[in-house]
């Protein structure tokens, strides 16, 4: 866990097997300050790596680096926050499971690390050890990374997603992993279909549009008794048979 103080200092606690808390010990059960002669404006913690954005627009990375998620040109883990050379004028950062996405002041996105699910958004499945421009979108305002997927917002309000479809970007038309950013729109939501399928113990995000009622089916025949629920019943309710009825337009999870 990383904490950012109002004075621009960073505190870290937790598992440190790969150096992700910048502590010499294997783990720490209390928050300790990360010694860095910089003022930090933003922080982001991935699965086992950490990213810091200074008030100068530079970034420091440390922790697990087998996939290249630190963006420093190699695959070596480090417990020392290290400035990424050649990277400046950054305004936003986001660390996913094994990928890091950054947003520059000229509204361009760059990515590094694991790309097995297309999470770098560069059109290939090749991992990167240096930050690489995502060339198919621009004029970006913010970025947020999930486990193996990412979502970004443009200044015009459009939302784009890419990466792992089955564990993240489940309201795009292709219904497969996407290696480039794909625009998310209401016309691609689950609520515009007559049914969706859930495996037992799985969940999916649904977007309720004016087409309010549709059915949910669970695939695993080993289970005789199914139960269904939605996270936000103000958006949608679900009965024992799996029929979801929307209450108002919005987004919720069904499982």
Name each model-derived stretch.
Residues 1-195, 208-213:
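Eukaryote-biased RCC1-like beta-propeller repeat architecture
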Residues 186-255:
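Extracytoplasmic soluble-region selector
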């Amino acid at each position: 866990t990383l904490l950012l103080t109002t004075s621009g200092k960073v505190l870290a606690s937790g598992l440190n097997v790969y150096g992700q808390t910048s502590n010499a010990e294997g783990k720490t059960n209390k928050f300790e300050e990360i010694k860095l002669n910089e003022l930090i404006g933003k922080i982001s913690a991935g699965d086992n790596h950490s990213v810091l954005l200074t008030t100068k627009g530079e970034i420091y990375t440390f922790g697990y680096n087998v996939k290249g998620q630190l963006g420093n040109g190699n695959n070596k883990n480090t417990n020392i926050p290290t400035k990424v050379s050649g990277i400046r004028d950054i305004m936003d950062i986001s660390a996913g499971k094994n990928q890091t996405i950054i947003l520059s002041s000229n509204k361009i996105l760059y990515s590094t690390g694991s790309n097995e699910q297309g999470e770098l958004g560069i059109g290939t499945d090749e991992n990167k050890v240096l930050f690489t421009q995502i060339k198919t979108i621009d004029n970006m305002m913010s970025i947020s990374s999930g486990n193996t997927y990412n979502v970004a917002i443009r200044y015009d309000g459009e939302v784009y997603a890419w990466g792992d479809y089955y564990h993240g970007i489940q309201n795009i038309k292709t219904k497969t992993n996407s290696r480039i950013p794909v625009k998310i729109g209401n016309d691609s939501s689950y609520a515009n279909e007559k049914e969706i399928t859930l495996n037992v113990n799985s969940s999916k995000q649904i977007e309720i549009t004016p087409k309010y009622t549709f059915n949910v089916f669970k695939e695993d025949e080993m289970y005789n008794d199914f139960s269904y629920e939605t996270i936000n019943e103000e958006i949608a309710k679900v009965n024992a048979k799996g029929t979801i009825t929307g209450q108002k337009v919005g987004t919720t999870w069904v499982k």
